Amino acid sequence: MRNKVPTGRLGGTLVSRELVKYPDVFLRKVSKDVAFPLDDKTKRLITWMTRAMYQHNGIGVAAVQVGYDVRMFTMDCTRYQGKPQVFINPTIVKNSEETITDFEGCLSAPGKQGEVKRHIRITLNYKDEEGEEHQKTFYNMEARCIQHEMDHLEGKLCIDYEKGEYSRDKHNAQTMVDTDFRTKSDS
C-alpha cells in the first residue's frame, strides 16, 4: 500500500469514500502485489472499496481508485443480490478470441466514456481474502468488468481506448453546445 496508515491518497480516513478522479496521475500507477496474510488495514480497505462501489452506484472498484496502489478490486455485477466479490493479485490467464466493442464509463472519470473492445470470456487466477487461490472463467458483463478493473491495476483507463473522433463524451459535449446555442439565439 502507498500508506502505512488507513488513510489513502486522498488523505481521508476509511470512513470517507471519495474516489481518485481523472486526470489525477495516481490513476496511472501500476499496482503492486498484496502481501498475505492480509493485515487489518488491508481488510478495512476491502470493506471501504466495497462501500465506495455501492455508494457511487458502480459494479467494480480497484484499490487505486480509492488511493492505494495495490493489485486488488471488488466487483458486484449482480449487486441487487448484494454479493460483492474480492479479487486479490489477479491475473488473466486465458481469454476468448471473440470480442465485443461497447462504451464503458468509469467512476474515476465521471461524464466520460470510451469505446472499448473486450473479450467476452476470460479465465482469471486470483486470491480471495483468506489467501486461497482460485481459477475461474467469467463471461459477458463480468468478463468486461474484470478487464476494466484489471486495466486500473496497470494504470489504464477506459477512455484511453478512444477510437476515432466519435465518443459519447464528445457527442454529449457537442449536443450541450448546440442546445446552449439554440437557447441563447431563441431568446
Go through each PLM region and give its residues:
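Positively charged
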Residues: 2-187
